[in-house]
Amino acid sequence: MMTKLVINPVAFQLGSLSVKWYGIIMAVAIVLATWMAISEGKKRQIISDDFVDLLLWAVPLGYVGARIYYVIFEWGYYSKHPNQIIAIWNGGIAIYGGLIAGLIVLLIFCHKRDLPPFLMLDIITPGVMAAQILGRWGNFVNQEAHGGPTTLHFLQSLHLPEFVIQQMKIGGTYYQPTFLYESFFNLIGLIIILSLRHRKHVFKQGEVFMSYLLWYSVVRFFVEGMRTDSLYIFGIIRVSQALSLVLFIATIILWIYRRKVVKPKWYLQGSGLKYPYTRD
Protein backbone atom coordinates (compact mmCIF):
# COMPACT_ATOMS: atom_id res chain seq x y z
CA MET A 1 0.00 0.00 0.00
CA MET A 2 1.28 3.44 -0.95
CA THR A 3 1.41 6.14 1.70
CA LYS A 4 -0.33 9.37 0.79
CA LEU A 5 2.39 12.00 0.59
CA VAL A 6 1.51 15.31 -1.06
CA ILE A 7 3.94 18.22 -0.85
CA ASN A 8 2.53 21.48 0.47
CA PRO A 9 3.31 24.31 -1.99
CA VAL A 10 4.01 26.56 1.02
CA ALA A 11 7.46 25.83 2.47
CA PHE A 12 7.03 28.00 5.57
CA GLN A 13 5.38 31.12 6.94
CA LEU A 14 7.01 34.42 7.88
CA GLY A 15 4.20 36.08 9.75
CA SER A 16 1.46 36.63 7.19
CA LEU A 17 3.86 35.95 4.31
CA SER A 18 3.73 32.51 2.72
CA VAL A 19 7.09 31.43 1.31
CA LYS A 20 6.41 28.88 -1.42
CA TRP A 21 8.61 26.10 -2.68
CA TYR A 22 8.21 27.43 -6.21
CA GLY A 23 9.87 30.69 -5.26
CA ILE A 24 12.66 28.92 -3.38
CA ILE A 25 13.32 26.60 -6.31
CA MET A 26 13.40 29.49 -8.77
CA ALA A 27 15.78 31.45 -6.54
CA VAL A 28 18.15 28.48 -6.34
CA ALA A 29 17.89 28.06 -10.12
CA ILE A 30 18.84 31.70 -10.71
CA VAL A 31 21.81 31.49 -8.34
CA LEU A 32 22.99 28.27 -10.01
CA ALA A 33 22.67 29.75 -13.51
CA THR A 34 24.61 32.86 -12.46
CA TRP A 35 27.39 30.83 -10.85
CA MET A 36 27.73 28.64 -13.93
CA ALA A 37 27.92 31.68 -16.21
CA ILE A 38 30.50 33.45 -14.06
CA SER A 39 32.66 30.32 -13.81
CA GLU A 40 32.68 29.77 -17.56
CA GLY A 41 32.95 33.48 -18.29
CA LYS A 42 36.35 33.68 -16.62
CA LYS A 43 37.65 31.09 -19.09
CA ARG A 44 36.31 33.13 -22.03
CA GLN A 45 37.66 36.50 -20.80
CA ILE A 46 34.34 37.95 -19.56
CA ILE A 47 34.35 39.46 -16.05
CA SER A 48 31.79 38.45 -13.43
CA ASP A 49 30.39 42.00 -13.13
CA ASP A 50 28.97 41.74 -16.63
CA PHE A 51 27.03 38.59 -15.77
CA VAL A 52 25.70 40.00 -12.50
CA ASP A 53 24.59 43.22 -14.22
CA LEU A 54 22.94 41.22 -16.99
CA LEU A 55 21.14 39.12 -14.39
CA LEU A 56 19.71 42.21 -12.69
CA TRP A 57 18.03 43.19 -15.95
CA ALA A 58 17.27 39.83 -17.53
CA VAL A 59 15.53 38.12 -14.60
CA PRO A 60 12.81 40.71 -13.84
CA LEU A 61 12.26 41.57 -17.50
CA GLY A 62 12.24 37.87 -18.32
CA TYR A 63 9.36 37.40 -15.91
CA VAL A 64 7.58 40.38 -17.48
CA GLY A 65 8.08 38.83 -20.92
CA ALA A 66 6.83 35.47 -19.70
CA ARG A 67 3.70 37.13 -18.35
CA ILE A 68 3.06 39.25 -21.47
CA TYR A 69 3.39 36.16 -23.67
CA TYR A 70 0.86 34.28 -21.54
CA VAL A 71 -1.60 37.20 -21.44
CA ILE A 72 -1.44 37.66 -25.23
CA PHE A 73 -2.46 34.09 -25.89
CA GLU A 74 -5.12 34.16 -23.17
CA TRP A 75 -6.46 37.55 -24.23
CA GLY A 76 -10.00 36.26 -24.42
CA TYR A 77 -9.93 35.99 -20.63
CA TYR A 78 -7.75 38.98 -19.74
CA SER A 79 -9.64 41.38 -22.01
CA LYS A 80 -12.64 40.74 -19.77
CA HIS A 81 -10.61 40.76 -16.54
CA PRO A 82 -7.94 43.46 -17.05
CA ASN A 83 -7.36 43.69 -13.31
CA GLN A 84 -5.88 40.19 -13.49
CA ILE A 85 -3.19 41.06 -16.05
CA ILE A 86 -0.64 41.98 -13.40
CA ALA A 87 -1.80 39.30 -10.93
CA ILE A 88 1.19 37.09 -11.64
CA TRP A 89 0.88 35.59 -8.15
CA ASN A 90 -2.21 33.76 -9.41
CA GLY A 91 -0.09 31.93 -11.98
CA GLY A 92 0.24 32.33 -15.71
CA ILE A 93 3.73 32.65 -17.17
CA ALA A 94 5.23 31.01 -20.25
CA ILE A 95 8.87 30.01 -20.56
CA TYR A 96 9.11 30.92 -24.23
CA GLY A 97 8.05 34.46 -23.39
CA GLY A 98 10.76 34.63 -20.75
CA LEU A 99 13.38 33.34 -23.17
CA ILE A 100 12.38 35.86 -25.84
CA ALA A 101 12.50 38.75 -23.37
CA GLY A 102 15.81 37.52 -21.95
CA LEU A 103 17.30 37.32 -25.45
CA ILE A 104 16.24 40.90 -26.23
CA VAL A 105 17.75 42.12 -22.96
CA LEU A 106 21.01 40.29 -23.65
CA LEU A 107 21.34 41.72 -27.16
CA ILE A 108 20.80 45.27 -25.91
CA PHE A 109 23.14 44.69 -22.97
CA CYS A 110 25.91 43.33 -25.20
CA HIS A 111 25.52 46.28 -27.57
CA LYS A 112 25.84 48.74 -24.68
CA ARG A 113 28.81 46.91 -23.14
CA ASP A 114 30.50 46.08 -26.45
CA LEU A 115 30.43 42.36 -25.67
CA PRO A 116 30.19 39.53 -28.23
CA PRO A 117 26.49 38.50 -28.06
CA PHE A 118 26.82 34.99 -29.44
CA LEU A 119 29.66 34.16 -27.07
CA MET A 120 27.63 35.54 -24.16
CA LEU A 121 24.70 33.37 -25.22
CA ASP A 122 26.99 30.35 -25.35
CA ILE A 123 28.33 31.05 -21.87
CA ILE A 124 24.94 31.47 -20.19
CA THR A 125 23.19 28.62 -22.06
CA PRO A 126 24.18 25.74 -19.73
CA GLY A 127 23.08 27.79 -16.73
CA VAL A 128 19.74 28.53 -18.38
CA MET A 129 19.28 24.82 -19.04
CA ALA A 130 20.13 23.97 -15.44
CA ALA A 131 17.63 26.60 -14.26
CA GLN A 132 14.93 25.08 -16.47
CA ILE A 133 15.70 21.61 -15.13
CA LEU A 134 15.23 22.83 -11.56
CA GLY A 135 12.37 25.16 -12.37
CA ARG A 136 10.13 22.36 -13.62
CA TRP A 137 10.22 20.90 -10.11
CA GLY A 138 8.48 24.07 -8.98
CA ASN A 139 5.65 23.11 -11.33
CA PHE A 140 5.73 19.65 -9.76
CA VAL A 141 5.24 21.03 -6.25
CA ASN A 142 2.38 23.23 -7.47
CA GLN A 143 0.80 20.26 -9.30
CA GLU A 144 0.69 22.23 -12.56
CA ALA A 145 1.98 21.93 -16.15
CA HIS A 146 1.13 18.22 -16.06
CA GLY A 147 -0.10 15.92 -18.80
CA GLY A 148 -3.35 14.10 -19.28
CA PRO A 149 -4.86 11.44 -17.02
CA THR A 150 -3.02 8.17 -16.61
CA THR A 151 -3.04 5.20 -14.24
CA LEU A 152 -1.19 4.32 -11.07
CA HIS A 153 0.11 1.21 -12.81
CA PHE A 154 1.68 3.27 -15.60
CA LEU A 155 3.43 5.61 -13.17
CA GLN A 156 4.72 2.67 -11.16
CA SER A 157 6.02 1.08 -14.37
CA LEU A 158 8.30 4.12 -14.78
CA HIS A 159 9.90 3.24 -11.42
CA LEU A 160 9.25 6.74 -10.12
CA PRO A 161 9.76 7.61 -6.45
CA GLU A 162 6.59 7.34 -4.40
CA PHE A 163 6.51 11.06 -3.64
CA VAL A 164 6.44 11.85 -7.38
CA ILE A 165 3.61 9.41 -8.01
CA GLN A 166 1.53 10.76 -5.15
CA GLN A 167 2.11 14.38 -6.16
CA MET A 168 0.73 13.48 -9.58
CA LYS A 169 -2.57 12.41 -8.00
CA ILE A 170 -4.77 15.47 -8.31
CA GLY A 171 -8.44 15.41 -7.40
CA GLY A 172 -8.39 11.62 -7.22
CA THR A 173 -6.87 11.19 -10.70
CA TYR A 174 -3.28 10.40 -11.66
CA TYR A 175 -1.68 12.57 -14.35
CA GLN A 176 1.33 12.32 -16.65
CA PRO A 177 4.39 13.97 -15.00
CA THR A 178 5.31 16.05 -18.04
CA PHE A 179 7.40 18.30 -15.80
CA LEU A 180 9.63 15.28 -15.19
CA TYR A 181 9.87 14.34 -18.87
CA GLU A 182 11.00 17.86 -19.78
CA SER A 183 13.36 18.11 -16.82
CA PHE A 184 14.92 14.71 -17.60
CA PHE A 185 15.48 15.30 -21.30
CA ASN A 186 16.84 18.79 -20.64
CA LEU A 187 19.31 17.16 -18.25
CA ILE A 188 20.39 14.79 -21.03
CA GLY A 189 20.82 17.77 -23.35
CA LEU A 190 22.83 19.66 -20.74
CA ILE A 191 25.16 16.69 -20.21
CA ILE A 192 25.75 16.40 -23.96
CA ILE A 193 26.47 20.11 -24.37
CA LEU A 194 28.79 20.21 -21.36
CA SER A 195 30.66 17.16 -22.63
CA LEU A 196 31.24 18.78 -26.03
CA ARG A 197 31.67 22.43 -25.10
CA HIS A 198 35.37 22.32 -24.26
CA ARG A 199 36.43 20.02 -27.08
CA LYS A 200 38.45 21.60 -29.87
CA HIS A 201 36.81 22.27 -33.21
CA VAL A 202 33.31 21.28 -32.15
CA PHE A 203 31.45 24.53 -31.52
CA LYS A 204 31.88 27.87 -33.21
CA GLN A 205 30.68 30.88 -31.23
CA GLY A 206 26.90 30.82 -31.06
CA GLU A 207 26.62 27.07 -31.57
CA VAL A 208 26.36 26.10 -27.90
CA PHE A 209 23.30 28.34 -27.76
CA MET A 210 21.94 27.05 -31.05
CA SER A 211 22.45 23.45 -29.90
CA TYR A 212 20.25 24.25 -26.92
CA LEU A 213 17.59 25.79 -29.18
CA LEU A 214 17.52 22.69 -31.37
CA TRP A 215 17.40 20.33 -28.41
CA TYR A 216 14.79 22.23 -26.42
CA SER A 217 12.52 22.85 -29.40
CA VAL A 218 12.33 19.08 -30.03
CA VAL A 219 11.79 18.25 -26.35
CA ARG A 220 9.15 20.94 -25.92
CA PHE A 221 7.33 19.98 -29.12
CA PHE A 222 6.70 16.44 -27.90
CA VAL A 223 6.12 17.28 -24.23
CA GLU A 224 3.70 20.06 -25.15
CA GLY A 225 1.56 17.57 -27.02
CA MET A 226 0.93 15.78 -23.72
CA ARG A 227 0.08 18.80 -21.57
CA THR A 228 -3.42 19.84 -20.56
CA ASP A 229 -2.73 23.55 -20.07
CA SER A 230 -1.43 24.52 -23.50
CA LEU A 231 -1.97 27.95 -25.01
CA TYR A 232 -3.67 27.80 -28.42
CA ILE A 233 -3.83 29.76 -31.67
CA PHE A 234 -7.23 29.70 -33.37
CA GLY A 235 -8.30 27.19 -30.75
CA ILE A 236 -6.56 24.25 -32.46
CA ILE A 237 -2.82 24.92 -32.77
CA ARG A 238 -0.68 24.66 -29.65
CA VAL A 239 1.41 27.83 -29.48
CA SER A 240 4.49 26.17 -28.00
CA GLN A 241 4.46 23.41 -30.60
CA ALA A 242 4.19 25.91 -33.45
CA LEU A 243 6.95 28.06 -31.97
CA SER A 244 9.14 25.01 -31.40
CA LEU A 245 8.80 24.02 -35.05
CA VAL A 246 9.62 27.53 -36.27
CA LEU A 247 12.53 27.77 -33.85
CA PHE A 248 13.98 24.45 -34.98
CA ILE A 249 13.91 25.39 -38.67
CA ALA A 250 15.18 28.94 -38.06
CA THR A 251 18.06 27.68 -35.93
CA ILE A 252 19.23 25.24 -38.61
CA ILE A 253 19.16 28.04 -41.20
CA LEU A 254 21.07 30.38 -38.87
CA TRP A 255 23.64 27.69 -38.08
CA ILE A 256 24.34 27.03 -41.78
CA TYR A 257 24.44 30.75 -42.58
CA ARG A 258 26.93 31.53 -39.83
CA ARG A 259 29.17 28.59 -40.77
CA LYS A 260 29.22 29.43 -44.49
CA VAL A 261 28.98 33.23 -44.51
CA VAL A 262 29.86 34.73 -41.13
CA LYS A 263 32.58 32.19 -40.27
CA PRO A 264 32.69 32.98 -36.52
CA LYS A 265 35.58 32.17 -34.21
CA TRP A 266 35.71 28.90 -32.33
CA TYR A 267 34.00 28.97 -28.96
CA LEU A 268 37.24 28.14 -27.13
CA GLN A 269 38.92 31.27 -28.51
CA GLY A 270 36.88 33.35 -26.07
CA SER A 271 36.06 37.04 -26.27
CA GLY A 272 39.49 38.32 -27.22
CA LEU A 273 39.08 41.08 -24.63
CA LYS A 274 41.99 42.01 -22.39
CA TYR A 275 41.12 40.17 -19.17
CA PRO A 276 40.46 41.22 -16.48
CA TYR A 277 39.05 44.51 -17.69
CA THR A 278 37.17 47.04 -15.58
CA ARG A 279 33.89 48.89 -15.94
CA ASP A 280 33.61 52.59 -15.13
UniProtKB/Swiss-Prot annotation:
Molecular function as annotated in GO: phosphatidylglycerol-prolipoprotein diacylglyceryl transferase activity
Membrane topology value: Multi-pass membrane protein
Binding annotation for a 1,2-diacyl-sn-glycero-3-phospho-(1'-sn-glycerol): 136
Coiled-coil ranges from the UniProt annotation: none
UniProt entry tagged with the keyword Cell membrane: yes
Pathway noted in the entry: Protein modification; lipoprotein biosynthesis (diacylglyceryl transfer)
GO cellular component, one term: plasma membrane
Keywords: Cell membrane, Membrane, Transferase, Transmembrane, Transmembrane helix
Compartments where located: Cell membrane
EC number: 2.5.1.145
Biological process according to GO: lipoprotein biosynthetic process
Lineage: superkingdom: Bacteria
Transmembrane domains' residue ranges: 21-41, 54-74, 88-108, 176-196, 206-226, 236-256
Predominant place of localization: membrane
Protein family: Belongs to the Lgt family.
Xref: PANTHER family: PHOSPHATIDYLGLYCEROL--PROLIPOPROTEIN DIACYLGLYCERYL TRANSFERASE (PTHR30589:SF0), PROLIPOPROTEIN DIACYLGLYCERYL TRANSFERASE (PTHR30589)
HAMAP family the UniProt entry points to: Lgt
Function, as annotated: Catalyzes the transfer of the diacylglyceryl group from phosphatidylglycerol to the sulfhydryl group of the N-terminal cysteine of a prolipoprotein, the first step in the formation of mature lipoproteins.
Protein name, per record: Phosphatidylglycerol--prolipoprotein diacylglyceryl transferase
Organism: Lactobacillus acidophilus (strain ATCC 700396 / NCK56 / N2 / NCFM)
Organism lineage: Bacteria, Bacillati, Bacillota, Bacilli, Lactobacillales
UniProt gene name: lgt
